[in-house]
C-alpha cells in the first residue's frame, strides 16, 4: 500500500515581473497539492510534467534561491526535496552549480539515450565520457540531467557485488568527503542527500567513523601522557 502525504498550499497570482514565468509553467493549471505528494506514482507523474515544462530552469532557479533551512517540500524544477538539497551541498563542498543550458541539452532526444547508458557510472566518469563525445560538462550538471530523466544520479556508485557491506563500501570510497561534509555542518540528512544514499546507511557510516576517530584520539592522548 502506498501512503500519500500532502502539504496543502494555496495558489496565489503574482504580478511581479520576476515571477511572470509562473504563468507559463506546465503545472499552472494542475492541482498544486499533487506536487506535494510523496506517493510514488505522483512523484513520477510530476517529474514527467516538469520535464515537458518550458520554464523548468526558471522554476528550479527560483526554488533554490528561496528555499532554506531543513524544510523542503514537493517537486520543483523537476527535482525532489532531497535532490535539491544535494545541489545545495554540491555548491557548498565544491563551489559548483549545474549548467542549466547543458543539462537541458543532455535530456534532448539526441543525447538522452547516451546519458541513460552512462547512468551506472559515477557522475564524474559520465561527465568525462560526455566530454569525449563533444559535450563539455561536469558532475553536478550530469547529476541534474540524470534526475530529470528519472535516473538516480548518485555519487555513491551502484554496488556491483553484494559481497561488501554497503556501510564498509561507503566508508572505503568516501571517508574524506564524509569528513569534509561533517566539518561544514552537514547532518545525516545532508550527507545522505549529497551521496544519494539512504539516511540510515549514512547514520551507521558516520557513527562508525566518529567512533574510530574518538578511539584514535584517546590512543594519542594516552601515548602523549605516557
Enumerate the language-model features and the residues they cover.
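Short, basic interhelical loop/turn and adjoining N-cap
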Residues: 93, 104, 122-147, 164-166, ...
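Short, charge-enriched, intrinsically disordered boundary segments that mark the beginning
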Residues: 2-25
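Short, non-ligating residues that shape and space the ligands of small metal-coordination modules
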Residues: 59
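Short, amphipathic alpha-helical "recognition" segments used to contact nucleic acids or chromatin
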Residues: 103-122, 167-186
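Short Lys/Arg-enriched helix C-cap and helix-to-coil transition segments
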Residues: 147-170, 180, 210-226
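Short Fe-S-cluster ligation motifs
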Residues: 12, 21, 76-102
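Immediate flanking context of iron-sulfur cluster ligation sites
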Residues: 17-54, 65-68
Amino acid at each position: 500500500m502506498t501512503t500519500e502525504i500532502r502539504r496543502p498550499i494555496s495558489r496565489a497570482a503574482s504580478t511581479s515581473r520576476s515571477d511572470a514565468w509562473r504563468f507559463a509553467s506546465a503545472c499552472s493549471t494542475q492541482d498544486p497539492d499533487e506536487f506535494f505528494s510523496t506517493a510514488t506514482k505522483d512523484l513520477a507523474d510530476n517529474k514527467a510534467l516538469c520535464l515537458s515544462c518550458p520554464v523548468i530552469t526558471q522554476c528550479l532557479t527560483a526554488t533554490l534561491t528561496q528555499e532554506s533551512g531543513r524544510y523542503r517540500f514537493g517537486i520543483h524544477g523537476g527535482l525532489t526535496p532531497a535532490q535539491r538539497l544535494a545541489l545545495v551541498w554540491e555548491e557548498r563542498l565544491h563551489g559548483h552549480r549545474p549548467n542549466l543550458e547543458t543539462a537541458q541539452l543532455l535530456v534532448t532526444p539526441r543525447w538522452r539515450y547516451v546519458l541513460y547508458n552512462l547512468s551506472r557510472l559515477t557522475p564524474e566518469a559520465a561527465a568525462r565520457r560526455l566530454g569525449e563525445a563533444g559535450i563539455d560538462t561536469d558532475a553536478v550538471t550530469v547529476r541534474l540531467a540524470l534526475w530529470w530523466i528519472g535516473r538516480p544520479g548518485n555519487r555513491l556508485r551502484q554496488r556491483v557485488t553484494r559481497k561488501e557491506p554497503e556501510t564498509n563500501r561507503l566508508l572505503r570510497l568516501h571517508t574524506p568527503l564524509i569528513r569534509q561534509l561533517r566539518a561544514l555542518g552537514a547532518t545525516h540528512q545532508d550527507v545522505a542527500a549529497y551521496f544519494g544514499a539512504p539516511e540510515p546507511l549514512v547514520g551507521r557510516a558516520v557513527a562508525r567513523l566518529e567512533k574510530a576517530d574518538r578511539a584514535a584520539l584517546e590512543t594519542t592522548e594516552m601515548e602523549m601522557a605516557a
